[in-house]
Amino acid sequence: MDLQQSETDDKQPEQLVIYVCGDCGQENILKRGDVFQCRDCGFRILYKKRILDKKETRIGV
């Protein structure tokens, strides 16, 4: 196994995370290494957007 092959096998696709600005409410998509700041207003308090799995959703609520 070559060194280059092992590096490509270990790489995972970049995960994008959606954050909501605490000031203006704009959704921001950030990846690892991005500046943790709203792209519209520059506010630095962002909240991670919750994503519900199918098993977590409740029927009839």
Swiss-Prot record:
One Gene Ontology CC term in the entry: RNA polymerase I complex
GO molecular function: DNA binding; DNA-directed RNA polymerase activity; zinc ion binding
InterPro entries (UniProt xref): RNAP_P/RPABC4, RPABC4, RPABC4/Spt4
S-S pairs: none
Chief site of localization: nucleus
Any one GO biological process: DNA-templated transcription
Domain of life per record: Eukaryota
Keywords from the UniProt entry: Metal-binding, Nucleus, Zinc
Record-listed Zn(2+) binding positions: C21, C24, C38, C41
Classification via Pfam families: Zn_ribbon_RPAB4 (PF03604)
Record's subcellular location: Nucleus
Family: Belongs to the archaeal Rpo12/eukaryotic RPC10 RNA polymerase subunit family.
UniProt xrefs under PANTHER family: DNA-DIRECTED RNA POLYMERASES I, II, AND III, GEO11084P1
Protein name: DNA-directed RNA polymerase subunit 12-like protein
Gene this chain is encoded by: NRPB12L
